[in-house]
Amino acid sequence: MAAARPEAQSRSSPTPESRSQEPLDLVLVPDDCRPGTPPSDLIEIQVVKVTDTTLVPEPPEPGSFHCALCPAAFRLVSELLFHEHGHLAGAEGGGQGGDPSRCHVCGHSCPGPASLRAHYSLHTGERPYRCALCPRAFKALAPLLRHQHRHGVEPGTSRRPPDTAAVAEQRPGVAPERAEVVMAAAAAGAAVGKPFACRFCAKPFRRSSDMRDHERVHTGERPYHCGICGKGFTQSSVLSGHARIHTGERPFRCTLCDRTFNNSSNFRKHQRTHFHGPGPGLGDSGGQLGSSAAEGSGSGCGVGDPAEEGRGETAKVKVEADQ
């Protein structure tokens, strides 16, 4: 046993060339190199517990971690794990135990894909959200924003604050007392591909156009107006959907009952009436038709019964009038 230990250490120790590319405390070990484990193309991650006070090194350059099953590359190991979960879900029919939101490392079931993505960072110990004012790093954006708020209320920090006057000059409308928070949030969001921060709530975005659309929620600006009724909207896509109320255009058609809709939201809600369970058209039964659609009674779509059809049209008109 003692003779095998140096071999295991040499196998798991990164080479000098790879040490500069891999983050600290993360060891990538191919399954086929570990005795007693089933063959697999997926990598195994050594789990390391990292506390909030640990100084975490800078994240690796984009594309450092490559998927063994496809050409995809990722900046963080947790993103690679979430990507490989998709391969497992497709090969095993919905992930471990048939649950697409179940972690394939520990079997923990998460409420949804977003929670599952955040859960994988617990296995890797990565903290991509980094404070621009101190060496602290966090696993999620919410605790980082709470931490950064303390820099503005607690005196005696050893870190030099950012040039808030320059931020206010670049972003008109940013109050001087908010400029530090906005700049820190933008720096933290840049580490995860969201370098644009809202000047009102510091929410990060991937594109500046998305940030401007979001800021209209705070300012109340509605630059897109309907040419028929004059109603204003924050986004051009919402205006396009509103215009269908006036034109009568209904581009979304159900393939099961031929009902049409003027927006995708009502169309997806209608599709769920044909299937068991939640989801946009597919439920827990794997796409089995519900009793109303399978028996052809038309109770889910107002087909077959004149009274039901009339009630369906009344409800449809009411939905359109509310828009």
UniProtKB/Swiss-Prot annotation:
UniProt record, GO biological process: hematopoietic progenitor cell differentiation; regulation of transcription by RNA polymerase II
Residues modified to Phosphoserine: S13
Spans through the membrane: none
Keywords: DNA-binding, Isopeptide bond, Metal-binding, Nucleus, Phosphoprotein, Repeat, Transcription, Transcription regulation, Ubl conjugation, Zinc, Zinc-finger
Molecular function in Gene Ontology: DNA-binding transcription activator activity, RNA polymerase II-specific; RNA polymerase II cis-regulatory region sequence-specific DNA binding; sequence-specific double-stranded DNA binding; zinc ion binding
Subcellular location per the Swiss-Prot or TrEMBL entry: Nucleus
Record's compositionally biased regions (Polar residues): 9-18
Compositional bias per record (Basic and acidic residues), positions renumbered to this chain: 308-323
Keyword presence, Zinc-finger: yes
Skewed-composition ranges (Gly residues): 278-289
Entry's Gene Ontology cellular component terms: nucleus
UniProt region (Disordered), positions on chain: 1-26, 269-323
ZnF C2H2-type: positions: 65-87, 101-123, 129-151, 196-218, 224-246, 252-274
Superkingdom field: Eukaryota
Chain residue numbers at which the record places covalent cross-link Glycyl lysine isopeptide (Lys-Gly) (interchain with G-Cter in SUMO2): K318
Xref: InterPro entries: Znf_C2H2_sf (IPR036236), Znf_C2H2_type (IPR013087)
Keyword Magnesium: no
Coiled-coil residue spans: none
Summary of the function given for this chain in its UniProt record: May be involved in transcriptional regulation.
Protein family (similarity comment): Belongs to the krueppel C2H2-type zinc-finger protein family.
Name the UniProt record assigns to this protein: Zinc finger protein 784
The species this protein was found in: Homo sapiens
